[in-house]
């Protein structure tokens, strides 16, 4: 009888093409997502070598990082560097016969939102993209992670990837979440617990009753930020919630093929007694709405807390690092999180740009007005999310409240397009990174859930949404 295996073990074993004595493996790749930033050199490498894309039907190209989100983008991209990258992807996709969603396509959006929407992402698959937040797709019980540009070329040419297996880590979150506490709070709490290096060298499996109770969109939020916890990939075993989500997607199997797929997908779980090299446990009932205070995703506290004092940290290097973060953020120890005023709000990104995220934000914004002096923007994660939100009237709620309703794209998650912070501006953001300069030169980012961001836009400062009305 074979030894018990983890979910990661099973997917890995099913995709190993060859293994060397030192543990280096050649892994078959089921799906390859491509965007305009990390792909130009890869396609050029193919062109120079006279190679084709080995499996164009397993490759999907989407523009997201550089595209403007303003309504006038139909008139063209003004920024020359951005325009060149977008035009290059369009040409490369055409030259190599790869399906491509341009900024004029209703299916266009952030690549990690588009893949699941189209059923391109399915359980049990290996999925890669030249983007560290590819871990998002692990929510479906797939092994998904980011790769570098040279690896993008390798996958395009061979549909394989050279890898060494990571260790297994289990993050178990048990219990029931309190009202107002979301998947974003779970993932920020996990990173606060393990630190940004806690998952280094591991693939994380998220489990427990609190994870099981999440929708697919919530699970995607959790897996999305695995890389912020140091892990290249994070995954959740597929279940009935997963099957119900994927079955009506355009690229999902249908009829008898779907039944066969589901019978296989049901085997994708960690066996009883499977070995994990590291186990972390959290009590969902003890998680409150989370706000980041520093310049690392591990710098988090509950909204009811105060800005911590770095002098309480024993490690000298880390203590100095946290003081630098406070200086950059313009904060002082002991400040109540609810006293921190904001200038900007960004609701969107591959972490929180889905329809459920917009519904959460709209519930906070309904019948209210954005505070004077606050610039708040809503960026749907895809054209399909935007259409659904407008069909539900969410756009009207946001516009009447004073939010800016935008077109889909990565937007202010990163300062690679027109949406960015000015020096010194403080932003409540539903994105995944609060690094120095991430949202703009000297911009100050606080990571929060969509509901927390919307409430901050209305109040002009952070509030505990469990008590705020």
Curated annotation (Swiss-Prot):
This is 3-isopropylmalate dehydratase large subunit. Binds 1 [4Fe-4S] cluster per subunit. It comes from Brucella anthropi (strain ATCC 49188 / DSM 6882 / CCUG 24695 / JCM 21032 / LMG 3331 / NBRC 15819 / NCTC 12168 / Alc 37). Catalyzes the isomerization between 2-isopropylmalate and 3-isopropylmalate, via the formation of 2-isopropylmaleate. The keyword Cytoplasm does not apply. NCBIfam families: leuC (TIGR00170), PRK05478.1 (NF004016), PRK12466.1 (NF009116). GO terms for molecular function: 3-isopropylmalate dehydratase activity; 4 iron, 4 sulfur cluster binding; metal ion binding. Its EC number is 4.2.1.33. InterPro entries: 3-IsopropMal_deHydase_lsu, Acnase/IPM_dHydase_lsu_aba_1/3, Acoase/IPM_deHydtase_lsu_aba, Aconitase_4Fe-4S_BS, Aconitase_4Fe-4S_dom, IPM_dehydratase_rel_enz, IPMI_cat. [4Fe-4S] cluster binds at residues 350, 410, 413. It holds the Pfam family Aconitase. Keywords: 4Fe-4S, Amino-acid biosynthesis, Branched-chain amino acid biosynthesis, Iron, Iron-sulfur, Leucine biosynthesis, Lyase, Metal-binding. Its cofactor is [4Fe-4S] cluster. The keyword 4Fe-4S applies.
């Amino acid at each position: 009888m074979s030894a018990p295996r983890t979910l990661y073990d099973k997917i890995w074993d099913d995709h190993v093409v060859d293994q060397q004595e030192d543990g280096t493996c050649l892994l078959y790749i089921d799906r390859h997502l491509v965007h305009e930033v990390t792909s130009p050199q890869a396609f050029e490498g193919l062109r120079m070598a006279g190679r084709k894309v080995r499996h164009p039907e397993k490759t999907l190209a989407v523009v997201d990082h550089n595209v403007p989100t303003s309504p006038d983008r139909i008139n063209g991209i003004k920024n020359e560097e951005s325009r060149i990258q977008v035009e290059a992807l369009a040409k490369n996709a055409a030259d190599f016969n790869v399906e491509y969603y341009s900024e004029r396509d209703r299916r266009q959006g952030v690549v990690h939102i588009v893949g699941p929407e189209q059923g391109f992402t399915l359980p049990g698959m290996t999925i890669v993209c030249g983007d560290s937040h590819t871990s998002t797709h692990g929510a479906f019980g797939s092994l998904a992670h980011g790769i570098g540009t040279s690896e993008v070329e390798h996958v395009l040419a061979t549909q394989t990837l050279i890898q060494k297996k990571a260790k297994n880590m289990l993050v178990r979150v048990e219990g029931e979440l309190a009202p107002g506490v979301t998947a974003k709070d779970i993932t920020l709490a996990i990173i606060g617990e393990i630190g940004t290096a806690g998952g280094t060298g591991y693939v994380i499996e998220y489990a427990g009753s609190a994870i099981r109770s999440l929708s697919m969109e919530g699970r995607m939020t959790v897996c999305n930020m695995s890389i912020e916890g140091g892990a290249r990939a994070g995954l959740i075993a597929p279940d009935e919630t997963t099957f119900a989500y994927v079955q009506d997607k355009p690229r999902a199997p249908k009829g008898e093929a779907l039944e066969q797929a589901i019978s296989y997908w049901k085997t994708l779980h960690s066996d009883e007694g499977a070995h994990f090299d590291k186990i972390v446990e959290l009590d969902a009932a003890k998680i409150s709405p989370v706000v980041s205070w520093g310049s690392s995703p591990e710098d988090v506290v509950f909204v009811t807390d105060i800005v911590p004092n770095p002098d309480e940290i024993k490690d000298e290097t880390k203590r100095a690092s946290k003081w630098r973060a406070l200086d950059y953020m313009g904060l002082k120890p002991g400040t109540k999180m609810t006293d921190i005023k904001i200038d900007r709000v960004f609701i969107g990104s591959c972490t929180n740009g889905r329809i459920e995220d917009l519904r959460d934000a709209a519930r906070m914004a309904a019948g209210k007005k954005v505070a004077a002096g606050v610039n708040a923007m809503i960026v749907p994660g895809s054209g399909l999310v935007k259409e659904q939100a407008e069909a539900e009237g969410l756009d009207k709620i946001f516009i009447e409240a004073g939010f800016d309703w935008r077109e889909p794209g990565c937007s202010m998650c990163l300062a690679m397009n027109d949406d960015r912070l000015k020096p010194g501006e403080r932003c409540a953001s539903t994105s995944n990174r609060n690094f120095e300069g991430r949202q703009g030169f000297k911009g100050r980012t606080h990571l929060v859930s969509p509901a927390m961001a919307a409430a901050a836009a209305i109040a002009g400062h952070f509030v505990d949404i469990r008590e705020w009305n």
